[in-house]
Amino acid sequence: DGGAYGSYGVASLYYTGALQTVTYDVPTYRFRGARAFTNKPPGGPKRGHGTTQPRFAVEVHLDKIAEELQLDPAELRLRHLVKPNAVTANWLQLGTVGLAACIEKVVEGSRWKERFRKLPYGRGLGLACSSYITGAGLPIYWNDMPHSGAQIKCDRGGGVTIFCGSTDIGQGSESVLA
């Protein structure tokens, strides 16, 4: 649903398909999508930009698989994570992937092994993952232009200033650059 105008509907749909391969190892992949014009306001890039709804569907499906097979959902995810420096089925070049360490830290900090499937009726403990490819690697929009850049200015007093086109909208880009 891209709304009544062209806007970013096609780009969001592109991200929906392109970025589903960057969390879990998917050796073969096919995506078909359609962008529909509706009488709603135009959609555009906000947090997640085309990835949140399909990622939610994948994560719910993984939970259903784990439940049916009586597997630990955290271990199922860890077993199928994409590896660092991998090239995905749709030719996205990945660099560092810190998701395994993140899951392990969450499992430890939440006392997952002690509490999962052991809480009273109406209480639960869950886990879901997502990834987003950023920075280096192949650009999402294929062209020969640089797809990210920054300038660093060092002054005589030891100060450092970073100039870049990054806008922090809750995704932590200012913290990363600091």
Name every feature range the model reports, one short phrase each.
Residues 92, 116-122:
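Short coil/turn segments at secondary-structure boundaries
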Residues 1-54, 120-178:
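Gly/Pro-rich active-site capping loops and adjacent beta-alpha segments
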Residues 45-113:
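N-terminal leader/propeptide and maturation segments of large enzyme subunits in energy/redox metabolism
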